[in-house]
Amino acid sequence: MTAKNIRRAYHVIRTALHYGLDDLIPSKLTPWYFKLFRYSFFWLRNQHKDKVGGERLKLAMQELGPVYIKFGQMLSTRRDLLSDEWAEELAMLQDRVPPFDSAIARASIETELNAPIESYFNDFDDIPLASASISQVHTATLKSNGAAVVLKILRPDVEQKVHADLLLMSQAADFLETLLGTNNRLRPAEVVEDYRTTIEGELNLKLEALNAIKLRNNFIDSNALYIPYMYEELCFTRLIVMERIDGIPVSDKVALEAQGTNLKLLAERGVELFFTQVFRDNFFHADMHPGNIFVSREHPNDPLYIGLDCGIMGTLTEEDKRYLAENFLAFFNRDYRRIAQLYIESGWVSPDTDVAAFEQAVKVVCEPMFNKPLDEISFGHVLLELFRTARRFDMVVQPQLVLLEKTLLYIEGLGRQLYPQLDLWQTAKPFLEQWMAEQVGPKVMAAKVKQKLPYWAEHLPELPELIYDNLKMGRNLSKNQNNLLDRYLKHQQKAHKSNYLLITSAILVICGTILINQDATLWPSYGSIGTGIALWVLGWRSRPKNRKI
C-alpha cells in the first residue's frame, strides 16, 4: 500500500468509528486483536449513538464520497441482504458532486480526440449540462452536420480513485468475512465483487456506447422505446458523443399530464419493454432509475420512452430465463413445491436442499400475498421474497438475477407512479405464457432433438465406458472427500487469520512511523509500532505450514 492509500484507509476507519459502525458488529464476533487495535490506535467515541444503524451507515458513506455513495446506492437495491429500513435509508444517498473545471474537461476531450475541440464541434458549452461522480456532460453541435450532441467525459483521475477505494472495500469485506464466518448470510466479499464489476463497467464509456448501439438496434422500429444515436467514430474509453434528446423526465408526472400523455399506456409499455428486453432480446437496461428515463414530447397519445446511460446492462442464460418464467407462473398458480424444485433444478440452491422444508418456507412467505387483489401484487417483491427465502437455504449469489430484480422493482415503482391501477400480472402473463409455449412446445422440442442427433449418434458408442468410469470415480472420490474438505477448511482458517494479523501489523507500523515523522505524541506512535510488531510475530507463528492438503 502506498502512503496515499494508507492515509485514505486511516480516514475511512476514522469515519466508520466516528459513526459507530464497529458497534454494529456483535461483540462476541470481534476478536481480541481487533479490540486492541481499535482502542490502542483509534480512541474515537461513537458520536451518533442516538441514530439507528442504517442512518449511521448512510451518513458515513455520504462523508466518504462518491465511490462509497454509489456503493450505498447499490446496497439499497439488495433487499435480499438488508432489511427494508436499512435499504430505504441508503436509497436516500444522492450522487451529487460539483463539476470539475471546464479547462480540464476541454483538455481531456482533446486528448481523446487527438485534436482540438474546434476540429469536430461548434458551440461547445463550457458550463456542464450535468455532473456526477464518474463523469461530466457538455453540449455542442457537430461541425460536420450541425446536429446537437452531448459529450460525456470521465472525471480526471477517477479510475485511480475508484480502484484505491475498491481495494480498501475488498480488505474490509475480507475482514468481515473472517469475523462473520463462512456461513454468514451477508457474504460481504461477494457484494463488493459485484459492485466492482458494476462500477468498472461504468469506467469504460466505449462499452456504454456499444451497449447503447445494440439496444438501439433491438428497438430500431419500436414505437415504445428510443435510444439516442451514438457517433461511434467519436466514442472512446473516456469519452462518448451522442445525439442530444429533448424529453420530459419520466418522474415529472405534472408535465406529462399537462401535455396530455396517455399515462395508462405509458405504464403498460414500461412493463412490456422490460419483459421484451429480458425474454426476447436477452439484453436489458439494468439502470432504469427515473434519472435515465425520459418521455418524448411528440405523440402524447402514443407515448415513447427515451432511454439513456447504458453503462449497466444485464443478460440471462436460456436456462435462467426459463426458470424465471416458470417461477412467476408457479407463484401465480400457488404451486410452491414447483418453485422449490425450480430453485434446485436451476442450481441456484444446493441439490441437497430439503425440498419439503424449502416448499414450506416459500409458502409461509408467499401465501399472505394472495390476501391482496392480483393487480396489487408486485412482481419485484415476489422475486425479492423468493430470493430472501432462498438465501436462508444457502442460495449462491446470481449477479444477473440481482440486476433483474433491481430493474423490475424500478419498473414497477415507475409504472404505479404513472398509473396506480396498473395490473402487472394482466400485462405480463400473456407474454410469459407465449414465451414458455415457444420454448417448450412440441415444435421447439423436435427442432432441438434434430439439432442434437448428429452429436448423440457420434458419441453413443462411448456411453457404456463413460458410465463405468464415472461410477468407479465416484466410489474413489467419496472415500477421501470428507477428510480432504476438513483439512482444507482448517488450512484456510489459519491462512485468513495469519494474513489479517500480518496486514494489520504492517498498517500499525507504517502509521506509527508516519506519526513519528510528523512529530505526533510519542506514546500512540511507539505503541502502534509495538502493537504492530507483536501482531506480526503472532501472525507469522500462526501461519499454516507449507505442506500438501
Curated annotation (Swiss-Prot):
Chief subcellular location: membrane
Membrane topology value: Multi-pass membrane protein
One Gene Ontology term, aspect cellular component: plasma membrane
Keywords: ATP-binding, Cell inner membrane, Cell membrane, Kinase, Membrane, Nucleotide-binding, Transferase, Transmembrane, Transmembrane helix, Ubiquinone biosynthesis
EC number: 2.7.-.-
Start and end residues of each Protein kinase domain: 123-501
Record-listed ATP binding positions: 129-137, 152
Gene responsible for this protein: ubiB
Cellular location(s): Cell inner membrane
Pathways per UniProt: Cofactor biosynthesis; ubiquinone biosynthesis [regulation]
Family: Belongs to the ABC1 family. UbiB subfamily.
InterPro entries per UniProt: ABC1_dom, Kinase-like_dom_sf, UbiB, UbiB_bact, UbiB_kinase
Protein name stated in the entry: Probable protein kinase UbiB
Transmembrane segments: 498-518, 520-540
HAMAP family named among the record's database cross-references: UbiB (MF_00414)
Pfam families documented for this protein: ABC1
UniProt function note: Is probably a protein kinase regulator of UbiI activity which is involved in aerobic coenzyme Q (ubiquinone) biosynthesis.
Catalytic residue positions: 287
One record GO biological process: ubiquinone biosynthetic process
Organism in which the protein naturally occurs: Shewanella halifaxensis (strain HAW-EB4)
